[in-house]
């Protein structure tokens, strides 16, 4: 399975799509990619996060997928963060290597997607085109890691120090314990970014 399959599968079942309904499947994959990392779509992966209200308690996104694969993104009213063309674009560009987004069901052409703001915290995504899936896919293997817990947060965009501080403050606000309640605690910011990157990987 893939992250986006959690959304694509139910949409395909609900709408009765065939395995070669490439455009509809591509729309659902793009919708799944849009919400697969939760609050990254509502401001958590946005370079201009300092302009987004309520980042200390960001609302989770949702996606309404239509019969043709077009989608309306939104979030619950009264929660922090925002759903905008900027926040959705930032998430759609996350972890893609190029305009062709390969999946087990369809290859989604991210260079065909169009976004329109439909109102506060509502973005309409449409126009996405799909092609047959590739012959091969990558594989992930996981294993248990013991009794210790480690949390990593990948930060992208500008103002990395400010974003790291925001995330740390939000974590302790939500955590029922304080730093002194732990036997061992280490928080550090590891920088691997480049001042003037030439590639997406940098």
Predicted regions and their residues:
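A conserved active-site cap/scaffold subdomain adjacent to cofactor or substrate pockets
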Residues: 23-132, 148
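C-terminal non-catalytic interaction/assembly regions of soluble proteins
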Residues: 127-201
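Short, low-complexity, polar/charged sequence segments that are solvent-exposed and flexible
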Residues: 16-18, 53, 82-83, 92-93, ...
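Hydrophobic alpha-helical scaffolding
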Residues: 20-24, 78-82, 153-161
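Generic preference for flexible, low-structure residues
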Residues: 18, 50, 87, 108, ...
């Amino acid at each position: 399975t893939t992250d986006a399959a959690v959304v694509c599968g139910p949409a395909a079942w609900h709408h009765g799509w065939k395995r070669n309904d490439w455009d509809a499947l591509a729309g659902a994959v793009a919708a799944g990619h849009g919400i697969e990392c939760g609050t990254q779509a509502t401001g958590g992966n946005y370079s201009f996060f300092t302009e987004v209200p309520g980042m200390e308690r960001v609302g989770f996104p949702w996606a309404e997928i239509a019969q043709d694969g077009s989608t309306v993104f939104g979030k619950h009213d009264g929660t922090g963060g925002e759903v905008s063309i900027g926040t959705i674009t930032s998430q759609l560009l996350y972890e893609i290597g190029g305009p062709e987004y390969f999946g087990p069901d369809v290859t989604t052409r991210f260079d065909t997607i169009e976004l329109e703001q439909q109102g506060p915290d509502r973005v309409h995504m449409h126009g996405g085109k799909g092609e047959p899936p590739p012959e091969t896919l990558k594989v992930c293997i996981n294993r248990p890691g013991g009794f210790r817990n480690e949390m990593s947060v990948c930060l992208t965009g500008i103002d990395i120090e400010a974003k790291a501080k925001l995330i740390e403050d939000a974590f302790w606000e939500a955590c029922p314990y304080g730093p002194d309640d732990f036997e061992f605690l280490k928080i550090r910011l590891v920088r691997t970014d480049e001042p003037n990157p030439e590639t997406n990987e940098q």
